[in-house]
Structure formats: C-alpha cells, structure tokens
UniProtKB/Swiss-Prot annotation:
Binding site for substrate: H188, A189, A190, H191
Positions contributing to FMN binding: A25, S26, M27, S28, Q107, A346, R347
Enzyme Commission number(s): 1.-.-.-
One Pfam family matching this protein: Oxidored_FMN
Gene it is expressed from: iliE
Keyword Transcription attributed: no
Keyword Ribonucleoprotein: no
Superkingdom: Eukaryota
UniProt keywords, alphabetically: Flavoprotein, FMN, NADP, Oxidoreductase
Name of the protein this chain belongs to: NADH-dependent flavin oxidoreductase iliE
Function: NADH-dependent flavin oxidoreductase; part of the gene cluster that mediates the biosynthesis of ilicicolin H, a 4-hydroxy-2-pyridonealkaloid that has potent and broad antifungal activities by inhibiting the mitochondrial respiration chain. The biosynthesis of ilicicolin H starts with formation of the tetramic acid by the hybrid PKS-NRPS synthetase iliA with the partnering trans-enoyl reductase iliB since iliA lacks a designated enoylreductase (ER) domain. The cytochrome P450 monooxygenase iliC then catalyzes the ring expansion of the tetramate to the acyclic 2-pyridone.
Length: 401
C-alpha cells in the first residue's frame, strides 16, 4: 500500500500538529451519570480511542449550561460544582485521552430548542430557549405535531442579557478545558442547536443586534469565539463545526460563505463541515442518493459539494469534513482532491475504536477490504408509520461500548 495523504501530519493554525488526518468526530455518548461530570464509563471509552492512532479525537458535546441538555445523559458544566471540582474531574478524563499522545478537543454546545423534556435541570414547566419563539417541525400529521409539542414545546425567545450570559458560559467551559489539559475545544454551531438556530434565517427572526442580516445572525457565534479566545492562550486549539447548506439555493450559500468569512477572521484554527438537524437528520441519512455511478462520491461524502466551495474560498483554513465516509478510498480521495484537509469518522469509530491502526493505516489490509463497518438497525414498523423523520432514520449500532 502506497503512503496515504490521509496518513500525513497536519499543523493547525494554532500550531497544534496532528499525526494524521483521520479524526474521531464528535458523538453524544449518552451515558453520563447524574451530575454531568465524566465518570469511569466515559474514561474507559476514551481510553480505547486514545489507543486507536487517531490524528485527533473530538469528544461528544459537553453542554455549557446543565439546565439544557441534548439528551438526559449528556456531559455538562455542572452548575453545582466549583471550577476546581470540575477541573479535577475533567483532568482525569484528559489524562486518559492524551496517554498515547492523541490531541483531544472538547466539543462545547447548547441545545437551544432541541432540548427534550426531562433533559437538564430547567424543570418540566420551564420552556426551552431559542433566538425566536419557533417550535420544531418533526413532520406532517397529528402524531409528529403532538410529539414536537410534548417532547420539546414551543421555545421562548432569549433576551439579550441571556445571550451574553450564554456567551460567557462557552468561555468558562473553554477555560475549564484548558486548565484540565485538553488540547482545545470545538464550538458546536451545527445540527440545529442554539448557535445554528441563530445563524439560520428560518429560525432567527430577530430584529436586534443578533438578527435581521447575515452578519448580525453570526454575531452570537463571533462573540463566543472572541470570548473563548480571551480565556485561553493562542496555542490552545479553537475549532467550529458548522452546517452545510445546499448549493442549489445560491442566496443561502452566499449568506453562509459570508458568515464563514467572519468566523475565520475571528480566529478559529479549523472548520468542520457537517449537516442536519432534528427536523432533517442529514447527519444520519445524508442527502438524497446519487442517481448514477458518476456521482457515487456523494454517496459517502455527504457534504462534499459544500466542502469544496469552502475549501476554494478559504484555502488557508484547515477543513474537516464529516459524514458518510465508509472506506479508505473515499477518505483518501477527499483529501487528495482538495475537498478537505481532514476527514471525520463518527459511528464506525464506535464499532472499532482502533480503526486507524487496524484498518485505515494497516498496510496488510487491501484497499478493497479497508471498509469502515457501521451496521444499520431498521426503525420498527410502528415508528416508521408515525411520520417522524428523526425517529425513522437508520440508527447505527453503537452498543460495542
């Protein structure tokens, strides 16, 4: 097997050097114990990834406000704990992550309106928060509408003072990650969570400093990046994951590229391209399948078209592309053709935490056999009949943990 471009080191803008370009992308672990701090189960999972030979590991999303979680078992910044208590817990986690030299980043998030009932400490009668009071649309029909109303409710619009508080919560979480010994953080601005809700006109109808124009919709994210940067040294890695947009809608594409101009100028070290929301879970399904073999590149690299646009507009910014990759050849093609600098692998990494060593960079494994296994589980018939897209997706098996 010839040397792969994906196996070559890459140095990010902050000076952090990754030993290769294969990244364990973020996945919500969903096993946090009460208190939202990492326990032995979390450390055991990351101990496996630390041995895998990944270029970088990005943790599952850690919520910056434990009142609002994406699932009831998310890790979060525990509001009941002091900074020193959190650092003591996170330091044990970070020590496991870096024991084999793998750079590990903590992904920071706020779920916004995508906080299901019972997740977090905000109480059953307290509404979720969002840039604008617009509820989730989980599908057409009575059942999807009822599920949306019961599970998520209609969010309330955030006040400016609350937006500023959340901005500082991201900054505090980044400071805690730095003190704990992690190599950096990734700010989650994708998948329909709070920052993505601010970026998108459909979910942000504000007319103040945080909405009404492309630039003002990006203000929340830019303020977060600036606040994070003020709390950590320049050598501490700060990345952003952001949603792809469909290039068939030129005005939306222009808006997103403009927002990325602001993001790159704010001082991020890399950008990750992903996609999907609870309403439209492209992160699981990908875009519509190609109709011909000539377009098979898109059957694996879900968001490759948008990634190519971003790569051409911002050639000096390392680009991480995540979503759909299932074989060595497609990963190598994405890196060599300039679509991205790095490739993110999520669910196959749960099935095989040692994937870089045992498959991707194993010279004894032929290209034809170098597949990234991720079995599918069909949603039960009754769930599929409900018409709720997010429940009907093929959920991959991550029970290997």
């Amino acid at each position: 097997m010839a040397e792969l471009h994906a196996s070559l080191p890459i140095t990010l803008r902050c000076g952090l050097t990754l030993p290769n370009r294969l990244v364990k992308a973020s996945m919500s672990e969903g096993i946090s114990a009460a208190g939202s701090l990492p326990d032995m189960k979390i450390r055991n999972i990351y101990q496996r990834w630390a041995k895998g030979g990944w270029g970088m590991v990005i943790t599952g999303n850690v919520q910056v406000d434990d009142r609002y979680l994406g699932t009831a078992n998310d890790l979060a910044v525990d509001s009941r704990a002091s900074d020193d208590t959190i650092v003591a817990s996170w330091s044990r986690w970070a020590k496991v992550c870096r024991q084999h030299g793998t750079p590990t980043l903590v992904q920071l998030n706020h779920p916004g309106r995508q906080c299901p009932i019972g997740a977090g400490t905000h109480g059953y009668l307290s509404k979720n928060v969002a840039p604008t009071s617009i509820g989730l649309h989980m599908g057409d029909g009575l059942i999807p509408k009822a599920v949306s109303a019961i599970a998520f409710g209609k969010p309330r619009e955030l006040e400016i003072a609350e937006i500023r508080t959340i901005t500082q919560q991201f900054a505090r979480a980044a400071r805690l990650a730095y003190r704990s010994g992690f190599a950096g953080v990734e700010i989650h601005a994708a998948h329909g969570y709070l920052i993505d809700e601010f970026l998108t006109e459909r979910t942000n109808r504000r007319s103040d400093a945080y909405g009404g124009s492309t630039e003002r919709r990006a203000k929340f994210l830019i303020d977060i990046i600036s606040a994070v940067r003020s709390e950590v040294p320049s050598s501490f890695c700060v990345g952003v994951t952001i949603n792809s947009v469909d290039s068939v809608f030129p005005e939306i594409l222009v808006d997103r590229v403009r927002q990325l101009e602001l993001v790159t100028s704010a001082g991020v070290d890399f950008i990750e391209i992903s996609g999907g929301t609870f309403e439209d879970p492209l992160m699981f399904l990908g875009p519509p399948k190609p109709s011909s073999s000539a377009n098979m590149e898109h059957s694996e690299a879900y968001f490759v078209d948008f990634a190519k646009v971003v790569a051409s507009k911002f050639p000096d910014v390392p680009l991480l592309l995540t979503g759909g990759f299932r074989c060595r050849e497609s990963i190598e093609k994405a890196v060599t053709n300039g679509a991205c600098s790095m490739v993110g692998i999520a669910r196959p990494a749960a099935v095989n935490p040692l994937l870089p060593k045992t498959v991707m960079f194993n010279h004894e494994v032929k290209d034809s056999d170098a597949t990234l296994y991720s079995p599918k589980i069909e949603a039960p018939w009754l769930i599929r009949q409900m018409g709720i897209t997010a429940l009907s997706v093929h959920m991959d098996n991550v029970s290997s943990f």
